[in-house]
Amino acid sequence: MNAQFAMRTSQCIIMNYKLTIILLSLLLTSCGEYVRLQKSTDPEEKFQAGKNYFQEKKYTKSVTMFEEIVPYYRGTPQAEEVLYLLAESYMGQKDYYSASEYYQAYLRNFPRGTYAQEARYQVAYCYYLDSPDARLDQEATYDAINALSEFISVYPESNKVSECRKMLFEMEDKLAYKELLNSKLYCNLGLYGGNNYKACVTTAENALRDYPETKYRDDLVFIILKAKSKEASLSVAEKMKERYSEVIDEYYRYANAFPDGKHIKEANRILREAKNIVK
């Protein structure tokens, strides 16, 4: 029994060893072929290799092949495909910045090319994917909004329009949320270094104007009410009633728009406080 077990174990070890040798040989052959292609001076061979690597989803290698032959094929019938596949390879690598740059290069060179519609969509999608957290700089978000709007305008019948609209609303909501965060910050700063309550109100009002369909409308309208209430509570005596009257007006703006809003209890408390001052 022990002898049979030992024999089987030995056979497994030998099989694993052979398999390892085969895999290493294949890997070395593959690496050797890639190195050879890098050194090749034949652009057609590199073009075909790049397409093969792209089909195999070996995007790092396809990027290398295509980048090396872009200058050679410039002005030729193959230039369009080379440039587009290079952009697609960067997309496969999830290098959205580089991908967007090459998609745009494609559009500049081939505005009516075979892949023009897809390239324009991919530019917008790259910006969308590169859009950061709302707390960070939103340049990519603005770029995404512009590119998505442009795609919808240029290709209104495209089956991607619905998807683009969803991404567009998402990007606008992100900007609205950033303005909500800024409004909250101003409200919390209060009178530190100046009247930040006014800055809070202005920021929130601008967000409501710029993004009227945002899902943060409830929060934005409420932060205006809250800021005006806090400002009124810190007012000098001769201005207090006037400012609390504005608070009451602001309450009805909120309550009429959001009778079951998530801030309605706090809004009702603010109303009671305001009425006690104004009466």
Residue ranges of predicted features:
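Acidic, polar-rich low-complexity tracts and alpha-helical solenoid repeat scaffolds
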Residues: 27, 31-279
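Sec-dependent bacterial lipoprotein signal peptides
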Residues: 1-4, 8-31
